[in-house]
């Protein structure tokens, strides 16, 4: 459990089709951030796990074989019980116009790959604080 002011952020649901990214990110978020993290290898699995895991924040890769990150984001926003959950994209996109397009979708943050996994918890905290007026 990670306390952020009076807000407690506990659960992060993370989807990426790269096993190494999943493992490194999970370890960093659990050990550095103190979060409970559930990982899955596809967008469809993430959507299936939403109800049972009830995450406080979702991190999703932009390009996965079954669903793109934006498709996952749109589906989360269509569900009233989850439409306020902050979503962070992970992406290998490096062209500025594509990056701006991703940011314009309404996600909380976009993190470029490759990234330093130790900074992931910090970015998650900043997103969480920003969504709660801190």
Language-model region placement:
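Two-component/phosphorelay signaling modules centered on CheY-like receiver
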Residues: 19-38
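Acidic, metal-coordinating helix/loop segments flanking the phosphotransfer/catalytic sites
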Residues: 39-57
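Receiver (REC) domain active-site loop signature in two-component systems and cognate sites
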Residues: 64
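Short, glycine/charged-rich "phosphate-handling" switch motifs in NTP-dependent
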Residues: 108
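C-terminal output helix
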Residues: 115-124
């Amino acid at each position: 459990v990670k306390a952020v002011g009076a807000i407690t952020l506990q659960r992060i649901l993370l989807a990426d089709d790269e096993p190494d990214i999943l493992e490194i990110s999970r370890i960093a978020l659990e050990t550095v951030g103190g979060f409970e993290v559930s990982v899955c290898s596809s967008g469809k699995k993430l959507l299936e796990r939403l109800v049972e895991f009830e995450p406080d924040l979702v991190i999703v890769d932009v390009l996965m074989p079954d669903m793109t990150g934006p498709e996952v984001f749109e589906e989360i926003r269509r569900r009233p019980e989850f439409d306020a959950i902050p979503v962070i994209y992970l992406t290998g996109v490096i062209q500025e116009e594509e990056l701006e397009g991703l940011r314009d979708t309404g996600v909380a943050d976009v993190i470029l790959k490759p990234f330093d996994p130790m900074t992931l918890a910090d970015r998650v905290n900043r997103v969480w604080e920003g969504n709660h007026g801190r």
